[in-house]
Amino acid sequence: QDKVLKNTFASLRVYEHMKDLKTIGIINDDKVKKVMDVGVPLGVITALVPSTNPTSTIIYKTLIALKAGNAIIFSPHPNAKQCSFRALEIVKKAALEAGAPEGIVDGVTLLTLEATKELMHSKDVSLILATGGEGMVRAAYASGTPTISGGPGNGPAFIERSADIKKAVSDIITSKTFDNGVI
């Protein structure tokens, strides 16, 4: 049930939040400071997919890559092969139906460490979105390709003295037990 909520959040809530955001072209033009923010697509993004949250990761990363005008190639964890390939089918179909070009969303089919390393080191890849274990995230940073990663979850919780203690404890327990504590 928690995975369903994650997929719903990764798709509907994220889409609703960003659908009207301008991400390409002139985003902001401050005439007073004479500063302009310009969004430019990076090109091809490689996305590492963990075994713990494969479907929501694929949905979310597809949305943010396409919204920013980029292509994305996924490298799923071998232990999540079936659900990752199914999620990829769904997002590829949705992208095509929305008018995206063929091949803008894809994934490697040979799920080996060597294939992932080759993808991360490719000169055609502009950015790696690394979600996964510590070793894979380190390998992404060591590849020489710019990398954005999510670190390990399960951070500590702090209850400030003015907080409603019962509510804070309830919220912490809910957050730590949601999806068995998997971020």
What function would you assign to each model-found segment?
Residues 93-108:
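A glycine-rich helix N-cap at a beta->alpha junction
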Residues 27-72, 77-89:
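Substrate-binding/gating loop at the entrance of the active-site cleft, primarily
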Residues 67, 137-183:
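ALDH superfamily catalytic-core signature
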Residues 53-60, 66, 84, 130, ...:
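Short glycine/serine/threonine-rich phosphate/pyrophosphate-binding segments
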Residues 1-34:
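N-terminal Rossmann-like NAD(P)+-binding subdomain of aldehyde/semialdehyde dehydrogenases
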Residues 43, 125-126:
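Conserved acidic residues
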Residues 23-37, 106-125:
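A structured beta-alpha segment of the ubiquitous adenosine-cofactor-binding alpha/beta core
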Residues 56, 74, 106-109, 129-132, ...:
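General beta-strand structural signal in soluble alpha/beta enzymes
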